[in-house]
A protein has these predicted regions:
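Glycine/serine-rich phosphate-binding loop and adjoining beta1-alpha1 elements at the start
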Residues: 96, 115-229
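Structured beta-strand/loop patches that form or line metal/cofactor-binding pockets in enzymes
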Residues: 41-71
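Rossmann-like adenosine-cofactor binding region
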Residues: 264-362, 367
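Adenosine-phosphate binding glycine-rich loop
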Residues: 2-24, 220-221, 332-444
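Flexible, glycine/charged-enriched surface loops at secondary-structure junctions
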Residues: 19-22, 38-45, 119, 156-165, ...
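Glycine-rich phosphate/diphosphate-binding loop of Rossmann-like nucleotide-binding domains
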Residues: 193-196, 201-308
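Phosphate-interaction motifs
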Residues: 59, 64-122, 126, 130
């Protein structure tokens, strides 16, 4: 049995009932086989893989809070501090009913590599709760956030662990969390990112992940003598990542014809009117189906199936495992040439393999959606220097980081004779940096 297989079997045996975490570890270990086989003796001796797949720390806690009817509710809170070899733990907080330890370990594990690719000194972590902010009043969300931070504040800090937002955690939640941290610790420091602009936030942070997806797509297309000009694009989701991916793709000359939310999808052959989407999702917090009522010539379809619409570029920006094998086969049959992940692991393993084997150029989320965490790290830099950069400065730094990520992952893939295999390239480039740092710091 190979070293990677041994480590994977051990992960499955020691972490039963955690399929998302198993999937993330398997994908990474499989793609790193060429590097691991080359350095197997040294890695075994130092137990590099065994240490890499085991979080440094998992914090689990109860979160009691009182709802508007005066009833006490109890949720579970978590923080997975996965790897700090290259810097303080960095990764989002997710508030969603589906949150459990497996999902957070998968996200935290992926975060190690994504953060490594940014070239910035940040380690990997993730946290959250099974609390659902949907349908809750502002007071209930505040009560929950304050209770959650009352425990979490013992384990985080500007040089220790710097959480950010994720699904269910936007500007409102970050504000409540930060206020409670400051109140308890009496410290005004960059302990959270995604903050409001009036209290230490960074310009472009909201747009960063979506913009970054399109910047790296643009680099990929340029490298293949192509451009976004005149291309038909589908973007799944309708949250921050999706909205700003649509905005940047449109600015670069593409026509985005479809978006969706968890209920269904809209198709607008004339190109999505982003002002209407922003009004529905950001102002009214409504459902995407309202778009079809407001924009002539557009249609709304209940349920899944957005991939049946013809496109040149498909950007999955909604949630994990949203894009399966049959969907990718349909995309290929309809002439799709590029799939660039905006969400975390939105494409299943078999769908990813099919795309790459059948000539679709595929960029994995750990590379393509790293713009968000990169800009979070830029927010940390601004906080520690007590500075605030202009939108143009932050956008330029983001653009350069995404260019740099593309060149790193394509170079790593070519070095191992796997040109255009960006899944392998991303994992190798990220892994090598983390391992070098782990080796230098001894057995810790």
């Amino acid at each position: 049995m190979s070293y990677t297989e041994e480590v994977y079997e051990r992960v499955v045996a020691q972490n039963p009932g955690e399929p998302e975490f198993h999937q993330a570890v398997k994908e990474v270990l499989d793609s790193l086989k060429v590097v691991i086989d080359k350095n197997e003796e040294e890695y075994r001796k130092l137990a590099i893989l065994e240490r890499l797949v085991e979080p440094e720390r998992i914090i689990s806690f109860r979160v009691p809070w009182t709802d508007d009817k005066g009833n006490v509710q109890v949720n579970k809170g978590y923080r997975v501090q996965f790897n700090s070899a290259i810097g303080p733990y960095k990764g989002g907080l997710r508030f969603h009913p589906s949150v459990n330890q497996s999902i957070l370990k998968f996200l935290g594990f992926e975060q190690i590599f994504k953060n490594s690719l940014t070239g910035l000194p940040i380690g990997g972590g993730k946290g959250g709760s099974n609390f659902d902010p949907k349908g809750k009043s502002d007071r209930e969300v505040m009560a929950f956030c304050q209770s959650f931070m009352t425990e979490l504040c013992k384990h985080i800090g500007a040089d220790t662990d710097v959480p950010a937002g994720d699904i269910g955690v936007g500007g409102r939640e970050i504000g409540y969390l930060y206020g409670q941290y400051k109140r308890i610790r009496n410290l005004s420091e960059g302990v959270l990112t995604g903050k409001g602009l009036t209290f230490g936030g960074s310009l472009i942070r909201t747009q960063a992940t979506g913009y970054g997806v399109v910047y790296i797509l643009d680099e990929l297309m340029k490298a293949h003598n192509d451009s976004l000009e005149g291309k038909t694009v589908i973007v799944t989701g309708s949250g921050n990542v999706a909205i700003y991916a649509v905005e940047k793709a449109t600015q670069l000359g593409a026509k985005v014809v479809a978006m969706c939310d968890s209920n269904g999808y809209i198709h607008d052959p004339n190109g999505i009117n982003l002002d209407v989407v922003k009004d529905i999702k950001e102002v009214k917090r409504g459902r995407i189906k309202e778009y079809a009522d407001r924009v002539e010539g557009s249609t709304y379809t209940e349920g899944v199936g957005i991939w049946n619409i013809k496109c040149d570029v498909y950007l999955p920006c909604a949630t994990q495992n949203e894009l399966g094998l049959d969907a990718v086969k349909t995309l290929k049959a309809n002439g799709c040439k590029y799939i660039v992940e905006g969400a975390n692991m939105p494409t299943t393993l078999d769908a990813t393999e099919y795309a790459m084997e059948n000539g679709i150029l595929f960029l994995p989320g750990k590379a393509s959606n790293a713009g968000g965490v990169a800009t979070s790290a830029l927010e940390m830099s601004q906080n520690s220097m007590r500075l605030s950069w202009s939108a143009e400065e932050v956008d330029e730094k983001l653009h350069n980081i995404m260019k740099d990520i593309y060149s790193k992952i394509s170079e790593a893939a070519e070095r191992y004779d796997m040109k255009d295999n960006f899944v392998v390239g991303a994992n190798i480039a990220a892994f090598e940096k983390v391992v070098d740092a782990m080796k230098a710091q001894g057995i810790v």
